[in-house]
Design a protein with these regions (language model features):
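N-terminal leader/linker segments that initiate helical-solenoid repeat arrays
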Residues: 19-76, 80, 92-98, 309, ...
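TPR/TPR-like (Sel1-like) alpha-helical repeat modules
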Residues: 119-127, 243-244, 260, 268-287, ...
Length: 391
């Protein structure tokens, strides 16, 4: 019994000897946290961690050093203190989101540990969604954190060349934050994807830019992506929007091609197709000749009342027939005087002369009609030049 009493007394003395040390550590932490000067606070917190390894408030001290702005602080310190705080745990969701945001941002800005940065960013969005109804912060703050997490993830994925994943993350971020900068990020990604012939992903990236900012570059590139993906009706709408913003020969040519294909099924689209093809013939150096040829072909094919091609064929046939008649006539009667001809020969000659006259009249008529059709097309060309201000 006496030995037990001595043992209990010794244990009490030992425990009492620990209390000043623990209280001293707690006092140091409280002093550091209540210090108003950021630089002094940082110094005191570092001393606290160095002098009290495994202390009760180690997680909070590391968390504070991660988020605190003080002179001489390096990205490496932000990362080190932040990851230590995350490792120790015990932080509320809001503080954890703040630390994850800072650490992920450091990794992204350095272009290092991008997979980890992406994972941290995803955790931010997930934590914020889970705590949207908590009392730690207003719902608006959690929404901002959801958007920030998605945006950071997009940056990390973009730097790691995972463009498809980056597009998805940026879209999530924009849907929450509505920040115009995200549109520019999506436009840049969309262009990279388009240049890499990833047209479906490019379309996804460019849609928000085209439908929200509506600037020329976004609308035109989005129209190109739609066109590459076979969505010609949607592409046509955005090409027209882009053409209103800037009279580009390339755009006019694309519009003309789409409308010309529609005109093959419905002639009512022919005039509009002609307008854009003729515009392209003057505005697009690369496609000028092809656009003019397409316009000419469409003009004559679509004018059923003119029947230009049919009349050209008739003209060729009449010319050939006239040539044959003339040759036959000359062979039979070219070197003979009329007095030398028999009555039957005179009758035949008269008949051939009548046929020659008929063909000559036919050729004259067809030539006038085809010339009128050509002049009609030329008038379209002149009106196009006038509309575009071309001398």
């Amino acid at each position: 019994m006496r030995k037990s009493a001595i043992a209990l007394l010794a244990l009490s003395v030992f425990l009492c000897s620990l209390l000043p040390a623990q209280n001293s550590g707690s006092d140091a932490y409280v002093k550091a946290m209540t210090t108003p000067d950021a630089n002094e606070k940082a110094r005191l917190l570092k001393d606290y961690l160095n002098n009290n390894p495994g202390a009760q408030y180690e997680n909070f001290a590391n968390a504070e050093l991660c988020t605190l702005q003080y002179t001489g602080k390096t990205p490496a310190e932000t990362i080190r203190y932040g990851e230590r705080a995350l490792e120790l745990g015990g932080l509320d969701a809001l503080k954890k989101c703040q630390i994850l945001t800072l650490v992920a941002s450091m990794y992204v800005s350095q272009g290092q540990n991008l997979a980890k940065a992406s994972d941290y960013a995803a955790q931010i969005a997930q934590l914020a969604r889970s705590n949207r109804n908590s009392d730690l912060a207003p719902a608006a703050t959690w929404n901002q954190l959801i958007g920030a997490g998605s945006y950071l993830q997009g940056q990390a994925l973009e730097k790691s060349k995972n463009y498809r994943g980056a597009v998805s993350a940026y879209i999530d971020a924009y849907n929450v934050l509505k920040n115009p900068q995200i549109i520019q990020d999506l436009l840049k990604l969309g262009k990279a994807l388009y240049d890499g012939k990833a047209y479906k992903d490019a379309e996804t990236a460019l849609k928000i830019a085209a439908t929200n900012s509506k600037d020329f570059a976004s609308v035109y590139l989005y129209a190109n992506a739609l066109n590459k993906n076979g969505k010609t009706e949607e592409a046509l709408s955005y090409y027209k929007q882009a053409y209103l913003k800037q009279k580009s020969g390339a755009i006019a040519f694309n519009i003309g091609i789409i409308l010309a294909k529609k005109a093959e099924r419905d002639a009512s689209f022919a005039d509009e197709a002609l307008k854009y093809l003729l515009d392209a013939s003057f505005l697009s150096q690369a496609n000028s000749q092809k656009a003019m040829q397409m316009a000419e072909s469409l003009y004559f094919l679509s004018r059923k009342d003119v029947n230009y091609n049919g009349k050209v064929q008739q003209l060729q046939e009449s010319n050939k027939k006239l040539e044959n008649l003339t040759t036959t006539f000359n062979n039979k009667f070219g070197e003979k005087e009329e007095e030398e001809l028999s009555d039957s020969e005179k009758s035949e000659m008269k008949s051939m002369l009548k046929q020659i006259e008929v063909e000559q009249e036919t050729i004259k008529r067809l030539t006038a009609e085809t010339q009128a059709a050509l002049e009609g097309f030329q008038q379209l060309i002149e009106s196009t030049k006038k509309r575009l201000g071309i001398q």
